[in-house]
Amino acid sequence: MGITKLAHLIHFDAPASMRSKEIGDYSGKIIALDTSIVVNQFRSALPGHLKLSPLAGLFYRTLAFLEHDIKPVFVLDGKPPHQKRAVLEKRAQSTGWSSSQSPNTGSAFNQECLRLLHLMGVPCIKAPGEAEALCAHLAKIGTVNAVASEDMDTLAFGGTVLLRQLNAKRDSEITEYSLPKLLEALQLKYEEFVDLCILLGCDYCDKIGGLGPSRALKLIKEHHTIEGVMEHVNRKTHPIPLNWQYKDARKLFFETPKIDDPVLAWSEPDEEGLVQFLCKEKPLKEERVRGRMKKFREMLLKRRKQREVNMQMGQTRQSRLEDFFPATRKRRAESAAVKESSGRKQFKIK
């Protein structure tokens, strides 16, 4: 779920903090992805073959990212916080899985993801807790350029740049959210923003009844904290949950994941290893895997040749996807907007 109606609030109250992008705009960028969210997309799109379909989807999508010169970093969930247990059980029931089948808790499936990504030469990190929290932390400390996720709680965890709908299709429209610009537009401190997210509704506790996005924002601007809101809210129209665990939720959003800064490295995919895993041990067709790898090698060769041409012409910059596909009008307009706004004040996220 993430944060209830946060995207709605941003659309109406802070549109300057979001913009439309294309996948080519992230050529050369390092992007962190919550593996469970990527896997869930393939589970819903390709029912049946519980383990194969997500692995096949992960294989094809990762190759597409690499072809676009994106450096993906996949993060696996660790042990979920106890505050999220009820939410996970509810999700499992709604999808028809048992909780043990969920990618959040399936250690065997996590090992298969690790093996696949290792064979593809892509880094994969096991988070101590929520993968989303570690993704946000990596963006906050500058290890990655952005987080690709459909869950808005990336922003509540302090992720500086969130990408939604990054699905590896060249013509798809991606929505990019900037946390510093969002705080500026809403005129909130980061700590106030986290309390706003809890008021809107998150995965870790209940929420005050009857508070919509506009009302919650108004109350936080007036009273700055949840404690201040509780002192002034009408409890008849906005009942406060019994034994409300909002402080635990707040702590989870503020908490820094206990993990050493990862050393990230990418390498060429191991085609024979991939064929052995996906086609010999799993029932994916070998001709499909080899055909996709051939297309991938051709794209890499084309990029290298273009770089050589650029070097001969005295161009030392790294080649981007725009070198192979003409820039669209939207991309040129976005580039101009970025240059125009480059001098704006930035907020530091603690």
UniProtKB/Swiss-Prot annotation:
Binds 2 magnesium ions per subunit. They probably participate in the reaction catalyzed by the enzyme. May bind an additional third magnesium ion after substrate binding. Its EC number is 3.1.-.-. Its main location: nucleus. It is an enzyme of class 3 (hydrolase). Mg(2+) 2 binds at D151, D153, D203. Keywords: DNA damage, DNA repair, DNA replication, Endonuclease, Exonuclease, Hydrolase, Magnesium, Metal-binding, Mitochondrion, Nuclease, Nucleus, Phosphoprotein. Transmembrane segments: none annotated. GO terms for biological process: DNA repair; DNA replication. The keyword Metal-binding applies. It comes from Danio rerio. InterPro entries: 5-3_exonuclease_C_sf, HhH2, PIN-like_dom_sf, XPG-I_dom, XPG/Rad2, XPG_DNA_repair_N. Mg(2+) 1 binds at D34, D77, E130, E132. Belongs to the XPG/RAD2 endonuclease family. FEN1 subfamily. This is Probable flap endonuclease 1 homolog. Interacts with PCNA. Three molecules of fen1 bind to one PCNA trimer with each molecule binding to one PCNA monomer. PCNA stimulates the nuclease activity without altering cleavage specificity. Its cofactor is Mg(2+). Residues 110-223 are annotated as: I-domain. One of its GO terms (cellular component) is nucleus. Structure-specific nuclease with 5'-flap endonuclease and 5'-3' exonuclease activities involved in DNA replication and repair. During DNA replication, cleaves the 5'-overhanging flap structure that is generated by displacement synthesis when DNA polymerase encounters the 5'-end of a downstream Okazaki fragment. It enters the flap from the 5'-end and then tracks to cleave the flap base, leaving a nick for ligation. Also involved in the long patch base excision repair (LP-BER) pathway, by cleaving within the apurinic/apyrimidinic (AP) site-terminated flap. SUPFAM superfamilies: 5' to 3' exonuclease, C-terminal subdomain, PIN domain-like. PANTHER family: FLAP ENDONUCLEASE 1 HOMOLOG-RELATED, FLAP ENDONUCLEASE FAMILY MEMBER.
